[in-house]
Curated annotation (Swiss-Prot):
GO terms for cellular component: aspartate carbamoyltransferase complex. Involved in allosteric regulation of aspartate carbamoyltransferase. The keyword Metal-binding applies. One of its GO terms (molecular function) is metal ion binding. This is Aspartate carbamoyltransferase regulatory chain. Coiled coil: none annotated. It comes from Vibrio cholerae serotype O1 (strain ATCC 39541 / Classical Ogawa 395 / O395).
Length: 155
């Protein structure tokens, strides 16, 4: 007996679809863009089956279009995610995610002795990637941290 089943998430008319987010990262992305406080409808798929990733997260945000700058921040969490802008149920633009060279005023430095904690300065990290391993170097204390160490502080 062969029974075909297909999981579906409702299509959105206008907005942004972020697909291929690594599993367990979708909630962090929601918080990064403050979407958990949005008045717009947000559809969240967590731990969905994925042939490429094994499992993945998916976000659909109605009537919200993320910018190229926001897409760069997203690349820090999900460098291989796809971001589609939807208008009238059609994909009108695909944003290519590119890891930014530097990220400012998003995360605090994990080094408690860093001057960025006691001085009125914006946090600033230089980003680098090698073999899918993302590292952040603090502009002030010059310590290098794994992505997970820096991003877990705010999440």
């Amino acid at each position: 007996m062969s029974k075909e089943t297909k999981l579906q998430v409702e299509a959105i008319k206008n907005g942004t679809v972020i697909d291929h987010i690594p599993a367990k990262v979708g909630i962090k992305v929601l918080k990064l863009f403050d979407m958990h406080n949005s008045t717009q409808r947000v559809t969240i798929g967590l731990n969905l089956p994925s042939s490429a990733l094994g499992s993945k997260d998916l976000l659909k945000i109605e009537n919200v279009f993320i910018s190229e700058a926001q897409a760069s921040k997203l690349a820090l969490y999900a460098p291989h995610a796809t971001v589609n802008q939807i208008e009238n149920y059609e994909v009108v633009k695909k944003l290519a995610l590119q890891l930014p060279e530097r990220i400012n005023n998003v995360f605090a430095c994990p080094n408690s002795n860093c001057i960025s904690h006691n001085e009125p300065v914006e946090s600033s990290f230089k980003l680098s990637e090698k073999n899918n391993d993302i590292r952040l170097k603090c502009k002030y204390c010059e310590k290098v941290f794994a992505r997970d160490v820096v991003t877990e502080i705010e999440a």
